[in-house]
Amino acid sequence: MVRLATEKDIEKVNDLRRQVNELHVKGRPDVFKAGFGQELQDFAYTLMNGENSDILVVERDGVICGMACVDYVCKPETPYGMARQFYHVQEIAVDEVFRRQGVARELFEFMKADAEKRSLSKIELDVWAFNESAIEFYEAIGFKETRIWMEYKL
C-alpha cells in the first residue's frame, strides 16, 4: 500500500534516504558527502510539510519498505519555454531487503495515478550514470531519456 508519510515515519524514511546517499557517495565521492547529518535528516520535514511536495511510502505488513520524495511542479511560460506542469521525483528508495519485489513499481503506479489526478502531464526524474540498476528499471517501466548532462574534468 502506498500512502503519504507522516511524522511517525520520518526515522524509516531517513534510513532509506541514508541508503540512497551511501549509494551516491560510493558512485561519486567527488560530488557527494559521506554521512547523513541533521540537515539532511530535517529536509524530510520540509518535503513532508511543503505546499508542493510530499513523501510517499510503501508499506507492507506494517513495514515501510520504500519511499519517494516528490514535487508537484508548475512552471509558467517564459520567452524561451512553454508552460509545464509535472511530477518531479527527487528521491526514490527501496530498502535493500525488499528490492526486486515490486516495491518501486508499486510506487511508480501510485505516482502515475496521482499525477493524473493532479492534471500533471508527466513524471520527471534524474539519475546518475553510475546507477545502472536504477536506469535499467526506469527504462523498463517506460521512462525515456530526454537530456544528457556531461562534464569535463580538469
Where are these predicted regions, by residue range?
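A short helix-loop-beta-strand connector motif used in the catalytic cores of GNAT acetyltransferases and
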Residues: 42-57
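Conserved GNAT acetyl-CoA-binding A-motif
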Residues: 115-126
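Conserved GNAT-fold acetyl-CoA-binding loop/helix
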Residues: 22-44
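A conserved beta-turn-beta hairpin within the catalytic core of GNAT-like acetyltransferases
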Residues: 74-89, 99, 146-147
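Conserved acetyl-CoA-binding loop-helix of GNAT-fold acetyltransferases
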Residues: 91-94, 100-113, 140
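Conserved active-site alpha-helix within GNAT-family acetyltransferase domains
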Residues: 105, 109, 129-147
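Conserved beta-strand in the GNAT
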Residues: 57, 63-72, 88, 93
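A short beta-loop-alpha structural element at the N-terminal edge
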Residues: 1-15, 24
